[in-house]
UniProtKB/Swiss-Prot annotation:
CoA binds at residues 54, 107-109. InterPro entries: Cit_synth/succinyl-CoA_lig_AS (IPR017440), Citrt_syn/SCS-alpha_CS (IPR033847), CoA-bd (IPR003781), CoA_lig_alpha (IPR005810), NAD(P)-bd_dom_sf (IPR036291), SUCC_ACL_C (IPR005811), Succinyl-CoA_synth-like (IPR016102). It comes from Trichomonas vaginalis. Heterodimer of an alpha and a beta subunit. Keywords: Hydrogenosome, Ligase, Nucleotide-binding, Transit peptide, Tricarboxylic acid cycle. Succinyl-CoA synthetase functions in the citric acid cycle (TCA), coupling the hydrolysis of succinyl-CoA to the synthesis of ATP and thus represents the only step of substrate-level phosphorylation in the TCA. The alpha subunit of the enzyme binds the substrates coenzyme A and phosphate, while succinate binding and nucleotide specificity is provided by the beta subunit. This is Succinate--CoA ligase [ADP-forming] subunit alpha-3, mitochondrial.
Length: 309
């Protein structure tokens, strides 16, 4: 399990966000304006946005600042949500991290992989936590806080932590756990790009340390080793003896070499297969759902079996 220093060292809440998270929008175009309104309607503290050419104005009810350093100085923002188009998104991530953000959530798709290598390096140097890119963001129903494009009406405060590479399957799992009366503690969409910030293990560790999270749904897809790495950590810590974990892997029918949606969803050289991931997770004590419609049913059964409901 994780020590309390895990939270303190990152200068942020254990589950990335809480009711006091102050968010700044980078990329206040049509999408940035639309989703910033929805976030505020939900209850998120969105304190401003950055646009170098429109500093001093008000857009979508938000004060506009010249750069990230200025918005941090003026608002004490500690999290950034990025809608900047792909050519400038990496620079926006780096600017946010170097301005002192504890969390950066990048929605942008099609960021060049070479750019993301630079971003990952800066994130490591600054201690900033990156979620994404190419992700729906994250949501915490209990504090009415969300960063991203996740629809809020299917979520309800509760016991299940969800970590997913797929946006739509995130919503499937959330709706199922809401219908089952379990609800969600925090839901994190980590994105499907090859060079993502947070991976499954990073989020599962936080769920393991969080007292509100009593069960976990892990949603993966073909390609990469994020799911296998999570399975190794789950097995090492014997997590499933304390908290049930249910997993679904998308792309089981994908032919080798065929990309399935996300840039990272590709089986190459015999690695990253759905079966390989299922095998690793099952060996770690994770219950496998081979159909997304079973995720809610299986986590309910596991929670009941362990006396958590």
């Amino acid at each position: 399990m994780l020590s309390s220093s895990f939270e303190r060292n990152l200068h942020q809440p254990l589950l990335f966000i809480d009711k006091d998270t102050k968010v700044v929008i980078q990329g206040i175009g049509n999408q940035g304006q639309f989703h910033s309104r929805l976030m505020r309607q939900y209850g998120t503290k969105v304190v401003g946005a950055v646009h170098p050419k429109k500093a001093g104005s008000i857009i979508a009810g938000l004060p506009i600042f010249k750069n990230m350093k200025e918005v941090v100085k003026r608002t004490d923002a500690n999290a950034s949500l990025i809608f900047v188009p792909a050519p400038g998104a990496a620079a926006a991530c780096i600017e946010a991290a170097q301005a002192g953000m504890g969390l950066v959530v990048c929605i942008t798709e099609h960021i060049p992989q070479h750019d993301m290598i630079k971003v990952k390096k800066v994130m490591k140097e600054t201690g900033c936590q990156l979620i994404g890119p190419n992700c729906p963001g994250l949501i915490q129903p209990g504090t009415h806080t969300k960063l991203g494009i996740i629809p809020t009406n299917i979520f309800n405060n509760g016991k299940i932590g969800i970590v997913s590479r797929s946006g739509t399957l995130t919503y499937e799992a959330a709706y199922a756990t809401t219908l089952a009366g379990l609800g969600q503690s925090t839901v994190v969409g980590i994105g499907g790009d090859p060079f993502a910030g947070q991976l499954h293990t990073d989020v599962v560790k936080r769920f393991a340390a969080d007292p509100q999270t009593e069960g976990i749904i892990l949603i993966g897809e073909i390609g990469g080793t994020s799911e296998e790495d999570a399975a190794e950590w789950i097995a090492k810590t014997k997590l499933t003896q304390e908290k049930p974990v249910v997993a679904f892997i998308a792309g089981a029918t994908a032919p080798p070499g065929k990309r399935m949606g996300h840039a990272g969803a590709i089986v190459s050289g015999g690695k990253g297969t759905a079966e390989g991931k299922y095998k690793a997770l099952e060996a770690a004590g994770v219950r496998i759902a081979r159909h997304p419609g079973n995720m809610g049913k299986f986590i309910f059964e596991e929670m009941k079996r362990m006396g958590k409901i």
